């Protein structure tokens, strides 16, 4: 019975480490694969903020969020002028 418990614990540990590695890797990038609901919501990466933009609110670095929002405004203005 203890052999079964050891295998279960080992598998659970591997899955948990994989999830932690995914979060750590995505914190280095400008954009996260994590989506959020509201701009005040916290992201799992301390370097990312919840950014509201055209497609869907997404966690990203603050500077990238500012660039994305400026780009969306410019595209919207060009579309309205046509």
Swiss-Prot record:
It is found in: Secreted. The keyword Signal applies. Coiled coil: none annotated. It comes from the Eukaryota. GO terms for molecular function: toxin activity. Expressed by the venom duct. The modification 4-carboxyglutamate is found at residues 30, 34, 37, 40-41. Residues 77-82 form a propeptide. Residues 1-25 form the signal peptide. The modification Asparagine amide is found at residue 72. Contains 4 disulfide bonds. Its main location: secreted. GO terms for cellular component: extracellular region. Keywords: Amidation, Cleavage on pair of basic residues, Disulfide bond, Gamma-carboxyglutamic acid, Secreted, Signal, Toxin. The keyword Lipid metabolism does not apply. Belongs to the conotoxin I2 superfamily. The cysteine framework is XII (C-C-C-C-CC-C-C). This is Conotoxin Gla-TxX. It comes from Conus textile.
